[in-house]
């Protein structure tokens, strides 16, 4: 499995913990995030992750910023991306089962590092249920 990860300054500590967790599981990680606490612009780190997910060059993506909203809004501009903002593992389970989310967006300012590791574990272990949910996902793209 290969996962792309990106973060802004608010998510640096979380990203480092998530990368360590993923690598301990033998997962290849492409790190597009900052390693600094200096202020940066989150879209600069979202676009490489979303592009890799969109083009199916990685299996999944993880994005981390202060609220999670900016990274989710940016990632969801990509045609083949379904980015979900989550703040607990129950929501993570639903974005995978019902929405087949391929990018997990994490709000660093509203979660704890240990909680985020649990969320990532659920993200990796939860499968898409398909069925009626596949039909719904098929209706997401704009038909222009």
Which stretches of residues belong to each language-model region?
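C-terminal binding/interaction regions
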Residues: 4-6, 10, 89-144
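A short beta-strand-loop structural module common to alpha/beta enzyme folds
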Residues: 28-39
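Glycine-rich phosphate/diphosphate-binding loop of Rossmann-like nucleotide-binding domains
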Residues: 4-24
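Alpha-helical segments flanking ligand/cofactor-binding loops in enzyme cores
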Residues: 47, 51, 73, 93-96, ...
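Structural motif
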Residues: 38-47
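Helix-adjacent hinge/juxtasegments
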Residues: 48-85
């Amino acid at each position: 499995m290969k996962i792309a990860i990106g973060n802004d300054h608010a998510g640096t500590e979380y990203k480092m913990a998530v990368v360590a967790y993923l690598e301990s599981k033998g997962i290849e990680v492409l790190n597009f995030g900052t390693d600094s606490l200096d202020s940066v612009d989150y879209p600069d780190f979202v676009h490489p992750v979303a592009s890799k997910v969109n083009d199916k060059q990685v299996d999944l993506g993880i994005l981390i910023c202060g609220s999670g909203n900016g990274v989710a809004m940016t990632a969801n501009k990509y045609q083949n991306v379904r980015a979900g903002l989550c703040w607990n593992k129950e929501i993570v389970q639903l974005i995978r089962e019902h929405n087949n989310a391929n990018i997990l967006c994490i709000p660093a300012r509203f979660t704890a590092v240990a909680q985020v590791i649990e969320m990532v574990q659920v993200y990796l272990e939860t499968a898409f249920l398909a069925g009626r949910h596949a039909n719904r996902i098929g209706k997401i793209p704009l038909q222009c």
